[in-house]
């Protein structure tokens, strides 16, 4: 540093010392400490629950974990017309947490259990809409009377997985703002378009926001289910849920009534998708049962665990212990590599939530196999085999995957297991998985179908012609050429057919081997090495299992493609997987190739739905 630079530095230090001395005060009585920060704004959280026994433990657990000073929060909780234990769960939780919060208001109504004009517990009748509007208005009035800064409405089946949600919404400084909630479909808690009659209107703006291709806080005509109102804003005094505005002529629906109130008050609603805030279930049809509702939320919870950590219930409510079973299978096998502990823990928790008992099988880690292991097991690659997309030979990862399944087939044969299920650890379950699978097993028994293997999840590779439906068995087709072994059912006879083919001496990837064995592989040279190809293979339709991730997704990991060659451990195989169709999503099928439609969806195509 030059002499001039040193002098400037010393002068700066002298000025800094002088400033510090002045702030300390010349006399002791002039010294002062910096001002303390503002306290967090006060928030009233309003929860309205009806027949929400299946979702409340996790939803309340998410409230427990919110990073916000509890002493600055008041709780306003109402429940009514319940057939289940909603009231008991809420009462227990409130008793246990009430001392943590500034104020608690509890409004239960035990009787009657139904509205006079409703057809089922899921039916939104005129009386039910009106009652919900009155409850929301009562919560809003309570917040105003206690001079709360904000009111935060949270539906009893909306799962907040982001503990900073409340802080993030407050920081947006909007009069009405909602966090975008994820679901299994395109459905979410906002609209991008509204007709002149107040109904939902599909717009090109919706999907880019829903997919988070555009991120930010967007002005929208409708938010619902979970949203924050800033009561400090002057315009918020004109917002009401009930009675509807004097000029209101639209549908008698609580979310539309409030959207109209915002419009009349010239208050813009905003939807934020800057982060993953939480999840909500897709609405069911009005004739759905409470069991459907419970399973619907269970699926929401499982989807949340695919993308994030485990979802835990509140520690302040009593949770009945689940009793897993094998669903009439002789065994349910779960394949997992020991070092993939995140997948192992997620699948263990998921299967527990589904109440499915299973046997954990440590997968064979192909990279740990040395040449002597390979030689000792008599493993040789199928002559002429090349990966269809990269032209490479078999990888150690694919070898390990094959051996993992092969070892299960051996165990099935040795233990004489008549019917088994095999699951990998990188899958997600479709809604109503267990019930749909139980229905399939029942139909198989009634139809006396002669089967060896049934795909529960796969990638259909033959996309030109429809597959043959199976008479007498709903949701089942004869399987054509397919990829993936995410999950399948296998009979004792099927396992022995695969073993009798002696595949270790002519190995190819397991999801290429299976189509060879049911004689649907398009490359006849591969099939020619196996003289007996009579495996009776089928597939559920629609599928019950899908991968958790596809190529290009955040968090995608492949232990089969990201490996080394089977006979050359110095040659890595992590080629450009963007060119590999194998790990991409199912290609769109031509209309003439679609399989015969089976049972209808349990979801409504309603005005709120974005399916």
Swiss-Prot record:
Region called Disordered, residue ranges: 576-611
Reaction catalysis annotation: (5R)-5-hydroxy-L-lysyl-[collagen] + UDP-alpha-D-galactose = (5R)-5-O-(beta-D-galactosyl)-5-hydroxy-L-lysyl-[collagen] + UDP + H(+)
Short sequence motif named Prevents secretion from ER, residue ranges: 608-611
Composition bias type Basic and acidic residues, residue spans: 576-591
Sorted UniProt keywords: Endoplasmic reticulum, Glycoprotein, Glycosyltransferase, Signal, Transferase
GO biological process: positive regulation of collagen fibril organization
InterPro entries the UniProt entry points to: Collagen_mod_GT25, Glyco_trans_25, Nucleotide-diphossugar_trans
Domain of life (superkingdom): Eukaryota
Gene3D superfamilies: Spore Coat Polysaccharide Biosynthesis Protein SpsA, Chain A
GO MF annotations, alphabetized: procollagen galactosyltransferase activity
GO CC terms: endoplasmic reticulum lumen
Main location: endoplasmic reticulum
E.C. code: 2.4.1.50
Glycosylation sites: 85, 173, 370, 373, 568
Compartments where located: Endoplasmic reticulum lumen
Signal peptide, first to last residue: 1-24
Family: Belongs to the glycosyltransferase 25 family.
Function: Beta-galactosyltransferase that transfers beta-galactose to hydroxylysine residues of type I collagen. By acting on collagen glycosylation, facilitates the formation of collagen triple helix.
Name of protein: Procollagen galactosyltransferase 1-B
Natural source organism: Xenopus laevis (African clawed frog)
Gene: colgalt1-b
């Amino acid at each position: 540093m030059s002499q001039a630079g040193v002098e400037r530095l010393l002068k700066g230090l002298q000025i800094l010392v002088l400033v510090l001395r002045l702030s300390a005060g010349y006399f002791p009585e002039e010294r002062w400490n910096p001002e303390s920060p503002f306290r967090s704004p006060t928030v009233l959280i309003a929860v309205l629950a009806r027949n929400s026994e299946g979702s409340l433990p996790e939803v309340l657990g998410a409230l427990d974990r919110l990073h916000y000073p509890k002493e600055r929060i008041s709780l306003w909780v109402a429940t009514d017309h319940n057939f289940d234990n909603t009231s008991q769960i809420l009462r227990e939780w409130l008793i246990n947490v009430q001392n943590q919060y500034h104020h608690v208001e509890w409004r239960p109504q035990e009787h009657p259990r139904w509205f006079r004009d409703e057809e089922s517990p899921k039916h939104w009748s005129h009386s039910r809409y009106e009652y919900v509007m009155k409850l929301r208005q009562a919560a809003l009035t309570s917040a105003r009377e206690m001079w709360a800064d904000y009111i935060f409405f949270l539906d009893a089946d909306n799962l907040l997985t982001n503990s900073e949600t409340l802080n993030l919404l407050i920081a947006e400084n909007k009069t009405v703002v909602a966090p975008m909630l994820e679901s299994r479909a395109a459905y979410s808690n906002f609209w991008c378009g509204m007709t002149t009659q107040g109904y939902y209107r599909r717009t090109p703006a919706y999907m880019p926001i829903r997919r988070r291709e555009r991120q930010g806080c967007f002005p929208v005509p409708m938010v619902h289910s979970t949203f924050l109102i800033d009561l400090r804003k002057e315009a918020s005094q004109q917002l009401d849920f009930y009675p509807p505005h004097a000029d209101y002529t639209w549908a008698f629906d609580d979310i539309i009534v409030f959207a109209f109130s915002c419009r009349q008050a010239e208050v813009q609603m905003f939807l934020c998708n800057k982060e993953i805030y939480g999840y909500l279930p897709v609405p069911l049809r009005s004739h759905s049962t409470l069991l459907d509702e419970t399973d619907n939320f269970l699926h929401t919870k499982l989807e949340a665990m695919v993308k994030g950590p485990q979802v835990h219930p509140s520690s302040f409510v009593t949770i009945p212990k689940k009793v897993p079973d094998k669903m009439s299978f002789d065994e349910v096998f779960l394949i997992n590599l020991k070092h993939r502990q995140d997948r192992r823990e997620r699948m263990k928790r998921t299967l527990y939530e589904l109440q499915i008992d299973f046997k954990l099988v440590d997968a064979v880690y192909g990279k740990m196999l040395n040449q002597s292991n390979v030689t000792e097991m008599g493993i040789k690659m199928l002559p002429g085999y090349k990966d269809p997309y990269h032209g490479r030979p078999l990888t150690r990862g694919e070898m390990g995957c094959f051996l993992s399944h092969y070892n299960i087939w051996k165990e099935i044969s040795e233990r004489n297991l008549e019917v088994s299920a095999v699951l990998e650890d990188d899958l997600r379950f479709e809604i109503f998985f267990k019930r749909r699978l139980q229905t399939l097993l029942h139909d198989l028994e009634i139809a006396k179908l002669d089967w060896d293997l049934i795909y529960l999840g796969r990638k259909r590779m033959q996309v030109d012609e429809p597959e043959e439906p199976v008479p007498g068995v709903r949701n089942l087709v004869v399987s054509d050429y397919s990829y993936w072994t995410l999950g399948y059912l296998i009979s004792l006879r099927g396992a022995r057919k695969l073993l009798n083919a002696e595949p270790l001496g002519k190995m190819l990837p397991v999801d290429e081997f299976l189509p060879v064995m049911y004689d649907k592989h398009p490359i006849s040279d591969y099939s020619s090495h196996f003289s007996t190809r009579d495996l009776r293979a089928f597939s559920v339709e629609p599928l019950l299992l899908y991968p958790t991730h596809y190529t290009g997704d955040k968090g995608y990991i492949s232990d089969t493609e990201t490996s080394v060659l089977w006979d050359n451990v110095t040659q890595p195989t992590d080629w450009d997987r963007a060119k590999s169709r194998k790990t991409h999503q199912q290609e769109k099928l031509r209309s003439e190739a679609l399989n015969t439609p089976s049972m209808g969806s349990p979801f409504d195509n309603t005005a709120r739905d974005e399916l």
